[in-house]
Regions:
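Acidic, mature catalytic/reactive cores of soluble proteins
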Residues: 1-212
C-alpha cells in the first residue's frame, strides 16, 4: 500500500509518497519484499521549505546512537551493539538531514531507509521504478476484488489493510500495532507480531469472501 500526503503553503506545494516495495519477482515464483521503506517527495510548485527529523533508535533505544555519514548513506547503530544497523539513502544532502537543516525543495527527491547496505546504486530513477512496480502490484490486487455500489472505497481500504497483515508464507498478524506498550513506560506490552489463530481465521475468511485468491 502507498500512503500519499500532500503539503501546501504560500511557499509551494509537494506530495510525499511512503511505501514498502512489494511486487512479483521476475520469474513469477515469489515476491520481492525487502525490509525497507521508500519516501518519494514529488515537487509540484514553488520553493517549499521543510526539515527532516531523522532520529533512529536501534537496539530498542538502550544506548547512544552512532550516526556515520558516507558518500552514499547515513549509517546508524547502537554504541554497545553494532549488529543492528540501518542505512538511510537520499538524494538530498545527508549532512543537512543529520543536522536537521532547512531544506528548500525545487525538484523531486527521495529517501530510502533499509536494514541492508545496497550493492547497486540508489538514485531517483531507481526509486521511480520501485514505486511503479509497487503501485501496479496493488492496483492489480484490488482489481480482483468485488466491487460495491455503496462504501466501495471503505471496503477496498479495509481489504488492503488485511492484505498488509499477511505474510508470504500464509501467516496473518493479529494487528498492525505490533508491540506498542499499553502505556508509555509501563511493562504491559500487547505483542501482536505473532499469528493468532482466531484473528488470522477471521482475516482469511474476509479475504476469501471479498477477493479472488491471489498471491
Amino acid at each position: 500500500n502507498i500512503l500519499s500526503t500532500q503539503f501546501s503553503s504560500d511557499e509551494g506545494e509537494f506530495v510525499v509518497l511512503d511505501y514498502m516495495p512489494c511486487y512479483r519477482s521476475q520469474d513469477e515464483t515469489g515476491h520481492y519484499l525487502p525490509a525497507e521503506l521508500y519516501r518519494y517527495i514529488h515537487w509540484i510548485k514553488g520553493k517549499p521549505r521543510f526539515k527532516i527529523n531523522y532520529h533512529p533508535a536501534p537496539n530498542y533505544a538502550q544506548g547512544q546512537v552512532i550516526l556515520n555519514i558516507t558518500p552514499q548513506y547515513i549509517e546508524s547503530y547502537c554504541s554497545f551493539d553494532n549488529k543492528d544497523r540501518q542505512y538511510l539513502y537520499a538524494s538530498l544532502s545527508l549532512q543537512d538531514i543529520k543536522e536537521k537543516k532547512e531544506i528548500i525543495l525545487e525538484k523531486d527527491e527521495f529517501l530510502l531507509l533499509s536494514y541492508n547496505e545496497k550493492v547497486i546504486p540508489i538514485d531517483i530513477e531507481r526509486e521511480k521504478i520501485e514505486y511503479c512496480r509497487t503501485l501496479v502490484y496493488w492496483l492489480n490486487w484490488t482489481d480482483r476484488s468485488k466491487k460495491y455500489t455503496l462504501y466501495n472505497d471503505v471496503i477496498e481500504r479495509s481489504l488492503l489493510v488485511l492484505k498488509l497483515m499477511s505474510y508470504h508464507n500464509g501467516a496473518v498478524l493479529a494487528a498492525l500495532t505490533t508491540s506498542l506498550p499499553e502505556a508509555v513506560g509501563e511493562v504491559r506490552n500487547w505483542d501482536y507480531r505473532f499469528c493468532w489463530l482466531r484473528d488470522a481465521s477471521m482475516s482469511i475468511e474476509t479475504c476469501l469472501l471479498y477477493t479472488s485468491p491471489s498471491p
